[in-house]
């Protein structure tokens, strides 16, 4: 077993095209850690330390602040990925239902399905650039919230320092927009 000292990465949706890439897990901050090894009914716990890069004058508190911020951004990115998966599932359920009923579907139900599809598509398009089918498409179409969150993550993870004020402000704005979109999706799924 080898640990690369990184936290687990964010969830991802296969096939998505992102300009800024997917969000990986941040590297653990310097400090004291324990590893527990198990084999059958035997186990042993071993302590170890992660040391900061001596080329930087970064304090352990600064490293902790960076890691905590990166975990927050990673978790918000994961929420977006889960929402995109949920949208695909809802869309598939609507398609399956429509196919089962076929031509006999009452007009009122067909209109409701169309309305829900339009609503979830609007949320999906705010979360992800759905027109991006290749790496170059993101040059032609604006990036959306998932890609913007990945950009903030990348900026804040560069170097061994606390996140900049700009990164924190950008994240706060993006998190508010993301939460609004996720709230819309939740309302659509639960009420419609």
Enumerate the language-model features and the residues they cover.
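Glycine-centered tight-turn motifs at strand-turn-strand junctions
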Residues: 1-26
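Mature extracytoplasmic or organellar-lumen-exposed domains after removal of signal/transit peptides
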Residues: 32, 48, 79-192
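Short acidic/polar inter-strand loop motif in beta-rich domains
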Residues: 7-13, 38-46
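Active-site-proximal structural scaffolding
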Residues: 26-30, 41
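Generic beta-strand/beta-sheet core signal
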Residues: 4-6, 36-38, 51
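Low-complexity, Pro/Ser/Thr- and charge-rich linker/hinge segments at domain boundaries
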Residues: 45-81
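Generic recognition of flexible, low-complexity loop/linker segments
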Residues: 21-24, 34-38
